[in-house]
Amino acid sequence: NLLQYVEYAPVIAYQWIASNKPLYEIAGFQLLARLFANGKEPNDRGINEFLDQAAVALQGDNMGVKHAAANAVMRFCDFGEDFENIARGALKGIFEI
């Protein structure tokens, strides 16, 4: 995915995960997962937005969106125990980490 290399990739990813179009949501979560895997940590606002959108996606009906969101959450947790605890708290009762 070439989008991971442009400086505005996070902006696009956050716009896409907030979309109501499944293909955009999947692409947005996949892009965020790739950015997280590359070590690009989100800021506080990004963390809140990501976890809010992931919670909505994980409770939705589209299996592709759920899968992409779950992968992104797991990549987010790879940043360390603090990030894992944040995700665990935000997704309690929705997604088991």
Regions found by a protein language model. Give the residues of each.
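Alpha-helical scaffold domains
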Residues: 1-97
